[in-house]
């Protein structure tokens, strides 16, 4: 079932929760609504569900205008972050609940309900827990039961509000993979809310990035990461360092630091160069391409990677910089906390001083022999 949102807006008192926005969701897509708290993503999800009314605009499920249709008649399944399971009911009864409260004329037979519940529990790999109660389940098991209950009524659209937010990191990762696999198997249209960038990029066919009630960008995870269209999107996707640059003497400067742009660059202006943590090289000496001195303030192993936190020396940055390396690469570099190092960007994304529009990608693929004091 496709979803089309046209000119949707919402106010709570004087607060503009959603500015007029438009969004088309194709049948069978999994869409992630990503943004910080207060961005409007949950309000938008609730409006799609019918739990909130829009102040303006229209919502279509396929060719059906559901703008004024009550939530019970929209054929929507909803999964909450806190599961919302009934503690006094068994797992099987929780899954069956949505079917048993359907008006009698439309309600499946008792045998059909039992058959559907058994099938759903097997599908979520929890058939052996049918007679247990929610308090006897783990967080991950509860979320699977909540999903099975949402699917029991065979909804046209599945909506999920931060479905894995209450779970630990390992369980979240496992459930993300499981949900994506289930979605690909059943091919239902689904929309979920998250503030977790990794979750949005891993699960979504397309990501909708939101801020202050507006849609900032809609794209596939790969394209969104490769081509963020604004400073906000770049900042929110995380793991990015920002060099506030003044154009002087054919290079970008900031205090004692400088970066020489690639040859023939048209960007002879002030602005900001964004450099991702894995696109930053470190060495114990500066070079002709860049002079960006730091003190290493922390070295933190994170799984297969090591995060190096860097404090600027002689120039200004609002935040510490980060560089990421493999454990092997870190050993080769011989970095230690308290050491002075010099950074060089491999790739950067330049925004002009106004910060409007898409960034211009800058790459330093090679330099003339002898121009570097170390190999990048």
Swiss-Prot record:
Pfam families: ABC_tran, TOBE_3. SUPFAM superfamilies: MOP-like (SSF50331), P-loop containing nucleoside triphosphate hydrolases (SSF52540). InterPro entries: AAA+_ATPase (IPR003593), ABC_SmlMolc_Importer (IPR050093), ABC_transporter-like_ATP-bd (IPR003439), ABC_transporter-like_CS (IPR017871), Mo/tungstate-bd_C_term_dom (IPR008995), P-loop_NTPase (IPR027417), Sulph_transpt1 (IPR005666), TOBE-like (IPR024765). GO terms for cellular component: ATP-binding cassette (ABC) transporter complex. It is found in: Cell inner membrane. GO terms for biological process: sulfate transmembrane transport. It catalyses: sulfate(out) + ATP + H2O = sulfate(in) + ADP + phosphate + H(+); thiosulfate(out) + ATP + H2O = thiosulfate(in) + ADP + phosphate + H(+). ATP binds at residues 35-42. It is a peripheral membrane protein. Belongs to the ABC transporter superfamily. Sulfate/tungstate importer (TC 3.A.1.6) family. This is Sulfate/thiosulfate import ATP-binding protein CysA 1. It comes from Shewanella oneidensis (strain ATCC 700550 / JCM 31522 / CIP 106686 / LMG 19005 / NCIMB 14063 / MR-1).
């Amino acid at each position: 079932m496709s979803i089309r949102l046209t000119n949707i807006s919402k106010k709570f008192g004087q607060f503009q929760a959603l500015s007029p926005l438009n969004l088309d969701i194709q049948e069978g897509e999994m869409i992630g609504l990503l943004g910080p708290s207060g961005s409007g993503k949950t309000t938008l999800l609730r409006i799609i569900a019918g739990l909130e009314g829009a102040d303006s605009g229209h919502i279509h499920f396929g060719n059906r205008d559901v703008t004024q249709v009550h939530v019970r008649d929209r054929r929507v399944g909803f999964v909450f972050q806190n599961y919302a399971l009934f503690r006094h009911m068994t797992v099987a009864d929780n899954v069956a609940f949505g079917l048993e409260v359907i008006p009698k004329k439309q309600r499946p037979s008792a045998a059909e309900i039992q058959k559907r519940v058994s099938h759903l529990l097997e599908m979520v790999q929890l058939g052996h827990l049918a007679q247990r109660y929610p308090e006897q389940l783990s967080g991950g098991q509860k979320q699977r039961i909540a999903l099975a209950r949402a699917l029991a009524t065979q909804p046209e659209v599945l909506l999920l509000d931060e479905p894995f937010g209450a779970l630990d990191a390992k369980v979240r990762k496992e459930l993300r993979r499981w949900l994506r696999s289930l979605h690909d198997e059943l091919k239902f249209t689904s929309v979920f809310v998250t503030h977790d960038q990794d979750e949005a990029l891993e699960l979504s066919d397309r990501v909708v990035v939101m801020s202050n009630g507006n849609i900032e960008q809609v794209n596939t995870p790969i394209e969104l990461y490769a081509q963020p269209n604004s400073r906000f999107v770049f900042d929110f996707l995380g793991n990015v360092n920002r060099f506030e640059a003044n154009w002087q003497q054919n290079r970008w400067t900031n205090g004692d630091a400088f970066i020489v742009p690639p040859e023939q660059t048209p960007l002879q202006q002030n602005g900001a160069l964004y450099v991702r943590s894995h696109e930053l090289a470190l060495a114990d000496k500066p070079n002709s391409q860049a002079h960006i001195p730091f003190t290493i303030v922390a070295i933190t192993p994170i799984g297969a990677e090591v995060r190096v936190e860097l404090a600027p020396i002689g120039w200004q940055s609002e935040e510490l910089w980060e560089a990421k390396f493999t454990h092997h690469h870190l050993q080769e570099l011989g970095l230690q906390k308290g050491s002075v190092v010099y950074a060089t960007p491999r790739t950067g994304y330049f925004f002009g001083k106004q910060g409007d529009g898409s960034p211009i990608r800058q790459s330093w693929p090679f330099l003339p022999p002898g121009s570097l004091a170390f190999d990048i």
